[in-house]
Amino acid sequence: MGFTRAILGSSGGIDSAVTLAIACEALGKEHVRAVLMPSQYSTGHSVSDAEQLSKNLGNPYDIIPIKNIYDSFLNELKPVFGDLPFSLAEENIQSRSRGNLLMAIANKFGYILLNTSNKSELATGYGTLYGDMAGGLGVLGDCYKMQVYALARYINREKEIIPQNILV
């Protein structure tokens, strides 16, 4: 592919944690950028866990809150959505906003965007097209969820790199 640097969204979840750790090992920590994009629905520990993971790995990371972007989308869609109840459409706006931000940064700085979906999610259709499924390389695309947890335990075999909260 020709890329020597990568970027990914770091959610504080197991898939992004394992993807980040593998990318840092493969490319070198200085060549992998993580972006934390909390929303009003993010838990405090997911942000702190993602931040701690990047500190443990030593890779650069950014925090870009998406609440204003999400609210702007909802505001613009209000005339179309009207009074219809909240649904998957609104939920997916968060994921697609994150995907757009990551692609913009990847394009600006010449990174490849790493997809963090695993094979279990892909097989069951659990993911958002143009959102968390965005990316030029799916590091975990051939790994079932159980294998992702096994990889996390392997990564942590000598010391805690992936915070314990992510593993439970």
For each feature predicted by the language model, list its residue ranges.
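A glycine-rich phosphate-binding loop feature that marks nucleotide/adenosyl-phosphate handling sites
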Residues: T4-S16, I69-Y70, N118-S120, N165-V168
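A conserved beta-strand->alpha-helix junction
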Residues: H31-V32, L36, G44-A89, S95, ...
